[in-house]
Amino acid sequence: MAYTITSQCISCKLCSSVCPTGAIKVAEDGQHWIDQALCTNCVDSVHTVPQCKAGCPTCDGCVKVPSDYWEGWFANYNRVIAKLTKKQDYWERWFNCYSQKFSEQIQKHQGEILGV
C-alpha cells in the first residue's frame, strides 16, 4: 500500500530528508508529493516503518493510500468522528490547574500574614 502527502503537510521537508529512496518530490507550487514509482514503503529495508510517516511532525501529513475507496472513506469518517466525540477537557484542566495554584498562593499569603 502506497503513501501520500495530504493537505496537513506543513512543508517542513523532513520527510524528503528521511526517505531512503528519494521518493518525496516537491512540485513547482511547493507542494510535496510521493513518486509511487520510487516509493517502496520502506519494505525490505532496515526501517520497520515507512520513514515519511515516522518523520512527519504532523498527525496526518503522510498517510497510507487505501486500496479501496470505501476503506479510505470509512477511515476518514472514523477519524473525524473520533475527533468530534472526544471529550474536550482543555478548559477543565486549565481551571483545575489555575485553582490549585491560586489556592496555594492564598495559603502562602495567609501564612505570611499570620506569621507576622
From Swiss-Prot:
Keyword Electron transport: yes
Residue ranges occupied by any 4Fe-4S ferredoxin-type domain in the UniProt entry: 2-29
Annotated residues for binding of iron-sulfur cluster: C9, C12, C15, C19
Biological process terms in GO annotation: nitrogen fixation
UniProt KW keywords: 4Fe-4S, Electron transport, Iron, Iron-sulfur, Metal-binding, Nitrogen fixation, Transport
GO molecular function: 4 iron, 4 sulfur cluster binding; metal ion binding
Pfam family for this entry, one: Fer4
InterPro entries assigned: 4Fe4S_Fe-S-bd, 4Fe4S_Fe_S_CS
Protein name: Ferredoxin-like protein in nif region
